[in-house]
Design a protein with these regions (language model features):
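A glycine-rich helix N-cap at a beta->alpha junction
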Residues: 1-2
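Active-site-adjacent substrate-binding region
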Residues: 11-14, 18-105
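Short secondary-structure subsegments characteristic of cysteine-rich extracellular domains
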Residues: 106-115
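Structured mid-domain segments that build the active-site/substrate or prosthetic-cofactor binding neighborhood
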Residues: 118
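Short, glycine/acidic-enriched loop or turn micro-motifs at the edges of active sites
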Residues: 8
Length: 122
């Protein structure tokens, strides 16, 4: 199962807010979201399966990890996994200024998601 939402991209005005290693950028691919606190449903297996889907679709992917020293968001993916035991991955398209009046996302990432979704549903 895919839990599809958006993902925090590295904001050029607030680069220090992003994880120093996992830094999603706009128009650089679909983001696979991980959380050591299980705020996302992604595990090693589901991430590997989704990476293979991206490779088959010919689209790039990136990773996002919540910083360990700062609270972060979550999705409904981890909540639903408590009710239904299926393999699932939390993904999103990177955007700037999530939950603000002016969110910004990359149009190429939308095309990447459409291609990956087509492979997933085949």
């Amino acid at each position: 199962m895919i839990s599809a939402d958006n993902a925090h991209g590295v904001h050029p005005n607030y680069t220090e807010k992003a994880d120093p290693v996992n830094r999603p950028y706009l128009n650089k691919g679909i983001v696979i979201k991980h959380s050591a606190n299980q705020k996302y449903c992604t595990d090693g297996y589901s991430a590997a399966v989704f990476k293979d889907i991206c490779r088959q679709a010919g689209v790039p992917f990136q990773t996002f990890t919540n910083r360990s020293d700062m609270p972060g968001g979550s999705t409904l993916g981890n909540i639903s996994m408590a009710q239904v035991s299926v393999n699932a991955v939390d993904i999103g398209l990177p955007q700037l200024a999530m939950h603000s009046p002016y969110e910004t996302a990359g149009v190429e990432d939308t095309d990447y998601f459409i291609k990956a979704a087509a492979v997933f549903f085949e």
